Amino acid sequence: LKIAVITGSAGLIGSQACDFFSERGYKIIGIDNDMRAYFFGESSSTKDSLKSLKSKINDYEHYNIDIRDYEKLNEVFTEYSSDINIVIHTAAQPSHDWAANEPLTDFSINAMGTMNMLEVTRLNCPKATFIFTSTNKVYGDTPNYLDLIEKNTRYELKSETYKLKHYIGNDGSINEQMSIDNTKHSVFGASKVAADVMCQEYGKYFGMNVGIFRGGCLTGPNHAGAELHGFLSYLVKCIVNDKPYTIFGYKGKQVRDNIHSWDLVNMFWEFHQNPKQGEVYNAGGGRDNSISILEAIDTINKIAGTNWNNYTISDQNRIGDHIWYISDLKKFRTHYPNWNITIDLEKTITQMVEFEKNKLNKI
């Protein structure tokens, strides 16, 4: 019996991982206590997602456990022990605005929760592959000091910079060589750095198979977008439902690369076929799937057939927020040449618009 343990199993990446691994013959053990409702309010609860998981996946087994509870986690891991073939740890406090209000809660979940997961894996199923969803926020605000130029709809990297910096790839994107030190991370970023480094350590020191994926904007139709977190899904929600939206700083020209949850989980799968010990990968949509907020508004309007412009631009950017960030995917592609992006940004946005419209029709 091959078992996949997935934390944050009702979240965006977790639920996609449940589907993906279940389709490939794994028994799924899900761990999720819907902290999302506590972070962002009832409207962001993952209850519905959990219901649909249970109805879709026959032998899905759910544990309503807080990852800060070492004893309870250990009970689950002791029960299944070496049958556990892969652990996908996505559960987290995911918002940097929220983290600043409750730093202790944020750190206990992101850093200590991850530590607990690593340790129960080491003690019960040390040969399992361990996947950690880290974040590009581990690089702090270093990307904001790059040489950027302001264009009509977006900020862009000056092309001369490509050659000057060892951490900029050939297509003008950020690779894993960028330092995670000496920078302002946000409290959330710092707690994820602690977890990221500890995951590397369990790989390198204990020889465990650990993959660390530093996500750009992760998105897809299952995303319970909230204003503080998940910009694309929240923007789609506002446009389809004709609600106001606030852009925080940078004139709406801030750039992110977006990766669909399916393509990210497929990265985990490829890594799992030939795992490495404590390897880090930047995991985003890359340059081809990068977009600014202004460009996203245009694209969503086109796809949704709307003419929405109910947004205001606040001068106040979020502390430590990236002005421009695009992930260089070259390292992962070199290690795992079978992997590719299969769902581009336009397809992703189309799915999200359809998902929102269906919700609207059900009301």
Where do the PLM segments sit?
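N-terminal Rossmann-like NAD(P)+-binding domain of SDR-like oxidoreductases, especially those catalyzing
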Residues: L1-G216, E356
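Short, solvent-exposed loop/helix junctions and linker helices
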Residues: T7, I67, S108-A111, F188-G189, ...
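C-terminal substrate-binding subdomain of Rossmann-fold SDR/epimerase-dehydratase oxidoreductases
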Residues: A17, E23, C217, I239-I363
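Short, charged helix-to-loop "capping" segments that act as catalytic/coupling loops
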Residues: R36-S44, L73-N85, R122-T129, E227, ...
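Activation loop
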Residues: T46-S49, S95, F231, L235, ...
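Solvent-exposed, non-membrane alpha-helical residues enriched in polar/charged side chains
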Residues: K54, N74, T78, Q200, ...
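Residues in well-ordered alpha-helical elements
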Residues: E71, D97, L104, M115, ...
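NAD(P)-dependent short-chain dehydrogenase/reductase
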Residues: T142-S173, V187, V193, V197-H272, ...
